Regions:
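Short amphipathic alpha-helical surface micro-motifs
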Residues: 4-8, 230-231, 299-301
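Intrinsically disordered, low-complexity boundary segments flanking structured domains
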Residues: 8-12, 86-88, 149, 201
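Solvent-exposed loop and beta-edge segments used for protein-protein assembly and interaction
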Residues: 16-18, 41-43, 105-107, 120-122, ...
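Surface-exposed or secretory-pathway low-complexity segments enriched in glycine-proline
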Residues: 44-110, 114, 185-244, 286-290, ...
Length: 324
């Protein structure tokens, strides 16, 4: 080009000229990681979700972008898809499932999940969002989902995703005993609980109800029976309140000593999933025994005396008392 017109409106082919290099600076937003954990019912679960910055820093031709550690990670409820603010204790609770806590660990984020005592199954989980030093967040969508699919399938973006699963515990029974005097009725309530303890070191009770009643186990067949009245020859009659598991024992008048007792069985769900449903694998069975002891009654007599003048009839009643 030798004149202004050729420079402004070039046509044809130039056989000579200058070429200038131009360095294009490309920036990319950061992305998170998908993490899953599995733990037993009531136990705390933990994980670390990694975050990766991509591309170059906006104001540098030599420095790579990094996760901005001065910007706190953000928690998002996967059910509501809304950013949430944890409570004063740092936890955010999802009703019917459990509570979450996130803590920045350099560029990554530590996650803690404490399930509710009666929650089992896969939780909705949470999403975690971070920001890089270019001001970009992980809340972005790939234009080519085949080549670069979303990391977070819940929000359909690149936020970090954490999903915990809680497996059901077994059910265990606790035997009960009682003692009373000969002829007196006695009661005892065998109890049922999840094996072990929850994250606070407490036993979690499972009680009978209308849908899952307690039942006697036949002492002869060893099988569960539907009859709430059980007679044991030579001992007495046992009555079961199937909605509470309480057993009432009415001994035979002449029975003393420790009875053979009865076994109570409970088949019930140890928890429910995030939709409040009971899955077949959540239903467990345990047995517990109730054993009454009857102490023999003794009869003690009290002599009586009377006094009056000659030829006047006198009366008095000696007394007899039962005691153990």
């Amino acid at each position: 080009a030798k004149n202004a017109k050729e420079i402004e409106s070039p046509t044809g082919m130039a056989l000579s000229g200058e070429v200038e290099d131009f360095l294009t600076q490309v920036t990319f937003p950061p992305k998170g990681e998908r993490k899953e954990t599995t733990g037993v019912q009531g136990a705390k679960q933990t994980a670390t979700v990694a975050f990766t910055a991509q591309g170059m820093s906006k104001y540098s031709r030599t420095e790579n972008a990094v996760i901005d550690e001065s910007v706190a990670p953000v928690m998002i409820d996967n059910k509501t898809k809304q950013v949430v603010t944890p409570g004063a204790d740092g936890y955010y609770a999802v009703a019917g499932q459990g509570k979450y806590k996130i803590t920045a660990k350099g560029t990554d984020v530590d996650v803690e999940f404490i399930p509710e005592d009666n929650f089992v199954g896969t939780a909705d989980g949470i999403s975690i969002r971070r920001t890089d030093n270019n001001g970009y967040t992980t809340d972005w969508l790939s234009k080519d989902k085949v080549a670069l699919p979303s990391i977070n399938e819940v929000l359909d973006n690149m936020d970090g995703l954490y999903i915990p699963t809680v497996t059901p515990k077994e059910l265990e029974g606790e035997d009960k005993t009682s003692t009373d005097v000969q002829g007196a009725s006695q009661t005892g309530t065998p109890e049922f609980a999840l094996e072990g303890t929850n994250s606070n070191g407490e036993k979690v009770k499972i009680t009978p109800d209308f849908d899952y009643p307690a039942k006697f186990v036949s002492p002869t067949t060893g099988k569960v029976i539907n009859d709430p009245v059980l007679t044991v020859e030579g001992e007495g009659i046992y009555y079961l309140d199937d909605l509470t598991g309480k057993v009432t024992f009415v001994p035979e008048p002449g029975f003393t000593g420790t009875a053979k007792g009865v076994t109570v069985s409970l088949t019930a769900p140890v928890g429910r999933d995030k939709n409040k449903q009971v899955q077949s694998e959540f239903i467990k069975t345990a047995t517990a025994k109730y054993t009454p002891t009857v102490t023999p009654a003794t009869i003690s007599s009290t002599n009586k005396v009377s006094e009056d003048v000659q030829n006047v009839p006198q009366t008095q009643t000696p007394t007899f008392d039962l005691s153990n």
